[in-house]
Design a protein with these regions (language model features):
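Charged DNA-binding/catalytic regions of mobile-element recombinases
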Residues: 1-281
Length: 281
């Protein structure tokens, strides 16, 4: 493009002919004369949709934007999405790396082969616009990446943890294992006893081994990047509404790369597996 502009500049000032300018500057005359065809209305609409989705989801890369377009019925290549995003300056900045925690295990699950085989839970913190602390308990099914619950409180005690787990079990079934760090809420005797009575085994990650709890760490990174860092949370009530909306979006609308760019809900529906599968011990 710069060489074409140089040829146009030289010819425009009458310094030499097009033929000579192209020869000196190494530009083929057909290349110089080429003018891009105007985009068809459908292509313009597609371009605008790519830009709109990229602005709507600023932390989504080109693969996830392409998956969203496919959900809407658009047929678009990877390079086309990359080209438009590069032209519009919509490149996603690298995400910051996350750090996790750890805990005495009664089971040793590795990778969940089905829903409700392994759940994982942890805490994440944030602040309201006025500086008040928000403590959030997050709960995830490792197989489907489905977020089962995000409980938002000022403080979370063992009773809150048990009630949130009980609520998730009433709607999603009973997990065989729960993976977590060694947080005081998770190793509390009350929780240990309750889990044992319900035949739920525990898997505590080793100290300083965040990769052992990679699912929840990845979820927290996404949760902070796409929700907490973008929203002004005025108070606890608003935080609960905003975060629950995001949780539903993550489960029902957001394409997940590890699920073949399906949403967790669609992925589970495609498996044709009952949510009670984890109860078959």
């Amino acid at each position: 493009m710069q060489k074409k502009q140089a040829v146009a500049h030289v010819v425009g000032h009458g310094l030499c002919s097009v033929r000579r300018a192209c020869r000196y500057l190494g530009v083929h005359r057909s290349t110089y004369r080429y003018r891009a065809k105007p985009l068809a209305p459908k292509q313009i609409q597609l371009h605008q949709r790519m830009v709109a989705l990229s602005w709507q989801h600023p932390r989504y890369g080109y693969r996830r934007i392409r998956a969203l377009l496919a959900q809407e019925g658009w047929s678009v290549s990877r390079k086309q999405v990359q080209r438009v995003r590069r032209k519009e300056g919509l490149k996603v900045r690298p995400k910051p790396q996350k750090i996790p925690r750890q805990g005495v295990s009664t089971g040793l699950p590795t990778q969940a082969p089905e829903p409700n085989q392994v759940w994982t839970w942890d805490f994440i913190f944030d602040r309201t616009n006025k500086g008040s602390t928000l403590k959030m308990l997050t709960m995830l099914d490792e197989y489907s990446r489905r977020c089962l619950a995000i409980r938002v409180e000022r403080q979370i005690q063992s009773e809150h943890v048990l009630f949130t787990l009980w609520q998730a079990m009433t709607t999603d079934g009973i997990p065989r294992y729960i993976r977590s760090d060694n947080g005081s809420e998770f190793i509390a005797q009350k929780i240990q006893t309750w889990l044992r009575e319900n035949q739920i085994r525990t898997r505590y990650i080793d100290p300083g081994s965040p990769r052992q709890n990679g699912y929840i760490e990845s979820f927290h990174s996404r949760f902070r990047d796409e929700c907490l860092n973008r929203e002004w949370l005025l108070n606890l009530r608003e935080a609960r509404v905003v975060i629950e909306d995001w949780r539903q979006h993550d489960n029902e609308e957001r394409p997940h790369s590890r699920l073949g760019y399906l949403t967790p809900e669609t992925f589970l529906a495609n498996q044709k597996v009952s949510p009670e599968v984890g109860q078959n011990r």
